[in-house]
Amino acid sequence: MDMKKTLIALFAALMLPVATFADKYTGLWKEYDEAVKKDLPKSQINVLERIAASAAKEKSYGNLLKAEVRRINTLASISADSIPGAIRMFEAQAANAGNSDKALAAVYNCVLADVYEKVEWKSNTFPNAGQTAKDYARKALAHPEVLAAKNTGGYVPFVKEGTDSRIFNNDLLSVVGYTLKEYRRLNDYYNKTGNRT
């Protein structure tokens, strides 16, 4: 009986950090949502910076990316003048991730490709946005084998599971490829490797 109690206590102790992890982010995202409801952009940015700092330290990439993208959106809603600086910071983080985690760098590059594609027609601030978007898209898909081997679970809540996710074994390649509308490239890769279920 003592062995059973010991095992239960050990299991509970091992699960505690996971529960605390989830509760911390859930609490921070609720705090952020409250700041949004009250239209308090400075408070939103403060919470997002705390989420990003904690997530970077703990390698909770889904929370990190979600916080960083929301931060850029919040800064943009305050002042369009802050967009270039926020994007440059995001670019630096993408470059930094490229040195340590190719999958994380690919997601950063995918987001940057999407951002530059959307600003191309709206802004004189980014005169080469179209080409820059293509460059980031190319970087995002530079290592398809790494993305195909990486499950999207580590990128929640930034990435949400879709209805077709299981067809691609919930891999990151399908998310990046579909976001960038690289359907033919995905099809060619999956036909060659047989990664689809």
Model-derived regions, located:
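Positively charged n-region of N-terminal signal peptides that target proteins for export
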Residues: 1-6
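General helical structural elements
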Residues: 8-9, 75
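Bacterial N-terminal signal peptides
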Residues: 9-17
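Charged, amphipathic alpha-helical interaction segments
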Residues: 17-18, 118
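Boundary at the C-terminal end of the N-terminal hydrophobic targeting segment
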Residues: 20-22
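Extracytoplasmic/secretory-pathway proteins
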Residues: 24-197
